[in-house]
Amino acid sequence: MHLTFLRHAGLAAARILMMAAWFGLSVWAAGVVFYNVWGGPVLVWLYVAAMACAFALRRKRPVLWRASWGVPALLLAYYLCIPATNDKEWQPSWSRLPSVEINGNEIVVKDVRSFIYRTERDFDARYVTRRFDLDKLATLDFAVSHWDGMEFVAHTMLSFGFEDGKHLALSVETRLPEGVEQGSVPGLYKQFNVIYILADEEDLFALRTNYRKEDMYLYRINIDRENLKKAFLGFAEKINSLHERPRYYH
């Protein structure tokens, strides 16, 4: 009696887990159809209707039920094969990928963002070339910026400081194409590339404090020069790699 009860309870739990897995996969796959398939806003309704029918007829038409597991699997395979590309029209704030050239101790950074802002959305877009001396790399600051008073959410940035007073700020962000708005859900479906922005502090930091009115805090990182150089060179490698191997943000 006791074993029979446990057996039935185990089977019931397995069915619940199977249904939960099917539902989760189906919902996730609906996002793939919506965001990644041509005509997705229309096709997603056909997908939802087909999956609902398969669920409703799972006892009468077990073949349909089994096939409904294969559809999300096929969409997953399709999703994993979608390549990132740099060949899009990008919004001005993310229009150029920076590059870092290192010749001995000379650092040449191209396409450093140095915008002149009048408001958050009204600005003169400027990309410049900056030169630094690797041997003069001295400090690393960690910036934390909170928006809309949300202390539990923040955007983080870095700023590399040099002995001659120069700074090079770094921010890892989503690269938005023209006509596309920021969003957490689209980001889960390969809608945004990742971009490492290299910029003047007057651009990255002032944009947030002076125009977006965010609360920003700056912390000096305790790091020796050898590891500081390694960190800089590591970021430089990642930044340069995006020219040939673009990646998604998520």
Q: Where are each of the predicted segments found?
A:
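Juxtamembrane extramembrane loops of integral membrane proteins
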Residues: 105-106, 112
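Glycine-rich catalytic cores of cysteine/serine-nucleophile enzymes that process amide/ester linkages
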Residues: 107, 118-216
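Internal/C-terminal transmembrane anchor helices
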Residues: 61-84
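Active-site nucleophile-His-acid catalytic modules used for acyl/amide transfer and hydrolysis
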Residues: 202-250
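Membrane-embedded alpha-helical segments of integral membrane proteins
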Residues: 14-57
